[in-house]
Design a protein with these regions (language model features):
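Conserved AMP-binding A3 loop
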Residues: 32-34, 170, 179-205
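Structural core segment of the AMP-binding/adenylate-forming
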Residues: 9, 50, 77-157, 484
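Conserved AMP-binding/adenylation subdomain of ANL enzymes
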Residues: 202-221, 231-315, 324, 349
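Conserved ATP-binding loop and adjacent catalytic segment of the adenylate-forming AMP-binding
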Residues: 248-251, 328, 335-397, 405-408, ...
Length: 554
């Protein structure tokens, strides 16, 4: 397979879409593609004159914004290696990642700038403020001079105009060249630096072009909700759309469901990329209350009326997401079965994909028209997927993936790399699943999360949690093991409890009723013996999956 230059795709998009809108900070300023090119060129001049060379590491840590995107593009198209860091990480984690990655420069957002301690990152030559690219810290005279005289140097290099023909970016030498190092939060509680090669960025962009290229056109609007420092948001809310010539809107502050819903209504995106939590919250808050009255339930069960009612409900759900999208692509964590069953029953245009940072990220996908509910699609373009099981259709086994999207390995961690990528090039995901005869993959849980029943039965806590989360007043839950008993930690929906004027005793009674109902829905060996109320929301990773390693029954 011949893999073209990824940076050539970036360069071509900038030139082809020169006078079109490119990046907008929601309710703020807009950069056109030529503005992006000009900003990239200025950063290249600063890099060159401050001593940054090809292969140097440049870290970025801040909320999504147009300037974050520009700094990332400038890094790759200069030939440096990008190190995106999630802004939600604690300061010590940021320090550790900067140091471990050998970063030379660090771009920081406004909040991160006030939290980090430069003295704990001795290898850095400078810290640059993302909102205006000013210097927060400079440890070399070259960097100080380059930033102070940047406009002057740009004017000398381009005395009249900066034109399309001046755009001349670094082209990677081969597809295996390292493009970026992406540090995962990881379910084990420590970060690993995933080395993402250019071929993986291209593989994901080419996959997106294959499945969405005819549905999305230059100038279409896209909303960036997921953090760009996470591969899911990076690949499918930024890179593909930028290459396509779309107009990307950044929600620069922590987006609540209300803000997201408002943005959907105003921007009307052409495709929506999301994690289950966002979809579930919007459905539960904006849609379920309207359809859970007795009259609506009765109409839904009358065959003649049911179809029209479902069409009307589908329109309502679609309008909650802007009403202009080809499909909603959901990934990043397990999708609640109650919400998924509802969306499927009313004909909502959604699909669920599957991926991992180590595959930058896509592994499985299927268009909504052919999507099998409960699955996460089939092996994506350029990828192979198999289940490590003697009977992949019926007995869950580890999901393995192979193809150009797979990482080079973990930075400075050969042992972890060998444990994750075998000698035949298969990436071992750590997830358990089955595959039907048509190639649809069904995730059964993470192998690390698997619990053992009293008689050695495999118990997948996610399956129990999925049912429990659909019961009364349950916002979220974690199932843990104590000896041979299973205990469910439940964070209640306190807003709903308050609406119903329920006190602590009544809430406890509801949870006991939930436990009894839950146990009628699951095998005897996985019955829950106790529900404990957990007052605070569970801590989550940036992709909104619960950090279950933090919670025990003790």
């Amino acid at each position: 397979m011949e893999i073209p230059s990824f940076n050539a795709l970036i360069q071509k998009s900038i030139v082809d879409h020169w006078d079109m809108d490119a990046l907008t900070d929601y309710k703020g300023a807009t950069l056109q593609y030529h503005d992006v090119a000009r900003k990239i060129e200025k950063l290249h001049i600063m890099f060159e004159n401050s001593g940054v060379v090809k292969g140097d590491k440049i870290a970025l840590c801040g909320r999504n914004s147009a300037n974050w995107a520009v700094a990332f593009l400038a890094t790759l198209t200069y030939g440096a290696i990008a190190v995106p860091i999630l802004h939600e990480f604690m300061p010590d984690q940021i320090h550790n990642i900067v140091n471990h990655s050998d970063a030379k420069l660090l771009f920081v957002g406004d909040v991160v700038a006030t939290q980090i301690d430069a003295t704990k990152m001795p290898g850095l030559e400078g810290i640059i403020y993302i909102p205006d690219y000013s210097l927060v810290v400079s440890r070399t005279d070259k960097l100080t001079y380059a930033r102070e005289h940047l406009n002057e140097m740009f004017g000398i290099k381009y005395p009249k105009y900066f034109r399309k023909n001046h755009v001349n970016y670094y082209m990677e030498q081969n597809p295996d060249e390292l493009a970026m190092i992406n540090y995962t939060s990881g379910t084990t509680g420590f970060s690993k630096g995933v080395m993402v090669p250019y071929r993986a960025l291209w593989g994901n962009a080419d996959f997106a072009e294959d499945v969405l290229g005819k549905k999305i056109k230059p100038g279409d609007s896209i909303i960036s909700i997921l953090p760009m420092a996470h591969m899911y948001g990076m690949a499918f809310e930024f890179i593909f759309e930028f290459i396509k010539g779309c107009h990307i809107f950044y929600l620069t502050r922590i987006p609540s469901p209300a803000i997201i819903a408002e943005a959907f209504g105003r921007i009307k995106p052409a495709v929506i990329i999301s994690v289950p939590l966002v979809i579930e919250k919007i459905i539960r808050k904006k849609v379920f209350p309207k359809i859970q009255n007795n009259r609506m339930r009765m109409l839904l069960h009358m065959p003649v009326i049911s179809k029209k009612v479902k069409e009307k409900i589908c329109d309502q759900v679609s309008n909650a997401f802007g009403g202009n999208f080809y499909e909603v692509i959901i990934g990043g964590a397990a999708f609640n079965q109650e919400v998924e069953s509802f969306l499927h029953s009313v004909g909502f245009k959604y699909t669920v994909g599957y991926g991992a940072t180590e595959c930058a990220p896509i592994i499985c996908y299927e268009d909504y028209k052919n999507f099998v509910p409960g699955s996460c699609g089939k092996a994506a373009l350029h990828m192979m997927v198999r289940i490590d099981s003697p009977d992949p259709e019926n007995v869950p086994g580890e999901i393995l993936a192979k193809g150009p999207n797979v990482m080079l390995g973990y930075y400075k961690n050969e042992e972890a790399t060998k444990q994750t990528i075998d000698e035949n090039g298969w990436y071992h995901t750590g997830d358990l699943g089955t595959m039907d005869g048509d190639g649809n993959v069904f995730i059964k849980g993470r192998s690390k999360n698997m619990l053992l029943g009293a008689n050695g039965q495999n118990i997948y806590p996610e399956e129990i949690e999925d049912k429990l989360n659909s019961l009364a007043l349950v916002a979220e839950s974690v199932v843990v093991q104590k000896g041979d008993k299973l205990i469910a930690l439940v964070h209640p929906d306190y807003d709903e409890a308050q609406t119903l004027n329920l006190g602590t005793k009544e809430l406890t009674d509801v949870m006991e009723q939930n436990r009894q109902e839950l146990n009628t829905m699951i095998p005897a060996y996985s019955k829950v013996s106790e529900i404990r109320i957990h007052e605070d929301e569970f801590e989550k990773t940036p992709k909104k999956s619960i950090k279950r390693f933090l919670y025990t029954a003790e």
